[in-house]
């Protein structure tokens, strides 16, 4: 759905492992890396869209992850004219996104890039939370910085027992050390 200002409603996903490393997917047949993301369908909430995109692009189900938080407002980026589909030209400017920070409760073997007929990624890796964004397409970099910065305060949120939502008793202001990255190729 495109709003009256020309922005398509979308969700972005920052997925953390137990070391606070983030999931990066390599765009199929391209050299760019990105976080999972996708459009919100009519009648779908941002959270429902996030779970659908997580399953379609990464193969993870709701029980594989814990929601740590989301951005307070929509983050927007404009898409350069040469990237806009012909039938969208004239009324489409770009994307507006709600970003979710998730903790993987499962393991690496739960990730599958081939759960849909049209995979988005052909490889994936874990990388430090704060990493240079040169491998991200240029027009998305500022939104990535905004989302990572806003959600960084949640990095040290401890694992929460299933069904418990009492985050208010924890102090999430500190940040811990990050380690190197590991890469995974599509099977």
UniProtKB/Swiss-Prot annotation:
Its EC number is 3.6.1.-. Pfam families: NUDIX (PF00293). One of its GO terms (cellular component) is cytoplasm. One of its GO terms (biological process) is mRNA catabolic process. It is an enzyme of class 3 (hydrolase). Keywords: Hydrolase. A motif (Nudix box) lies at residues 38-59. The keyword Hydrolase applies. SUPFAM superfamilies: Nudix. InterPro entries: Nudix_hydrolase, NUDIX_hydrolase-like_dom_sf, NUDIX_hydrolase_CS, NUDIX_hydrolase_dom, RppH. It comes from the Bacteria. GO terms for molecular function: mRNA 5'-diphosphatase activity. Its cofactor is a divalent metal cation. Residues 6-149 form the Nudix hydrolase domain. Belongs to the Nudix hydrolase family. RppH subfamily. HAMAP family: Nudix_RppH. PANTHER family: M7GPPPN-MRNA HYDROLASE. Accelerates the degradation of transcripts by removing pyrophosphate from the 5'-end of triphosphorylated RNA, leading to a more labile monophosphorylated state that can stimulate subsequent ribonuclease cleavage. This is RNA pyrophosphohydrolase. It comes from Nitrosospira multiformis (strain ATCC 25196 / NCIMB 11849 / C 71).
């Amino acid at each position: 759905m495109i709003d009256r200002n020309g922005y398509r409603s979308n969700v972005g996903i920052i997925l953390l492992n137990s070391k606070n490393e983030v999931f990066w997917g390599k765009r199929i047949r391209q050299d760019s890396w990105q976080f999972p993301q996708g459009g919100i369908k009519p009648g779908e909430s941002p959270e429902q869209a996030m779970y659908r995109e997580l399953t379609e692009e990464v193969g993870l189900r709701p029980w594989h992850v814990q929601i740590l938080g989301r951005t307070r407002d929509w983050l927007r980026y404009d898409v350069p004219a040469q990237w806009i589909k012909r039938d969208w030209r004239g009324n489409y400017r770009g994307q507006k996104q709600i970003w979710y920070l998730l903790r993987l409760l499962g393991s690496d073997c739960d990730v599958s890039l081939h759960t849909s007929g049209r995979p988005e990624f052909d490889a994936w890796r874990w990388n430090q939370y704060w990493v240079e964004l040169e491998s991200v397409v240029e027009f998305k970099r500022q939104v990535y910085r905004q989302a990572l910065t806003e959600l960084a305060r949640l990095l040290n949120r401890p694992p929460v027992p299933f069904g418990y939502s009492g985050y208010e008793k924890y102090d999430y202001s500190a940040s811990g050390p990050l380690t190197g990255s590991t890469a995974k190729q599509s099977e």
